[in-house]
Amino acid sequence: MTPQGNKPSCHDVITNAWRPTATDSAAGRAPGYGVITNIINGGLDC
């Protein structure tokens, strides 16, 4: 439920409270399941 480092909160992503920054958009990060997977796995598996 709490953001950690450069990762947003899963709760914020699920509830549409998270809005991607210009850096997020440039990296292809958009609200949805893929971002949640990267948050949980730390981006190691994706």
Swiss-Prot record:
Give the Gene Ontology MF terms in alphabetical order.
Answer: chitin binding; endochitinase activity
Name the Gene Ontology biological process terms.
cell wall macromolecule catabolic process; chitin catabolic process; defense response; polysaccharide catabolic process
Instruction: Name residues in a coiled coil.
Output: none
Recorded hits in InterPro entries, A to Z, give: Glyco_hydro_19_cat, Lysozyme-like_dom_sf
Per its UniProt entry, which superkingdom is the organism in?
Eukaryota
Q: What class of enzyme is it?
A: hydrolase
Known catalytic reactions: Random endo-hydrolysis of N-acetyl-beta-D-glucosaminide (1->4)-beta-linkages in chitin and chitodextrins
Enzyme Commission number(s) of this protein: 3.2.1.14
Q: Where are the transmembrane segments?
A: none
Biological role = Defense against chitin-containing fungal and bacterial pathogens.
Q: Which family does it belong to?
A: Belongs to the glycosyl hydrolase 19 family. Chitinase class I subfamily.
Q: Which protein are we looking at?
A: Endochitinase 4
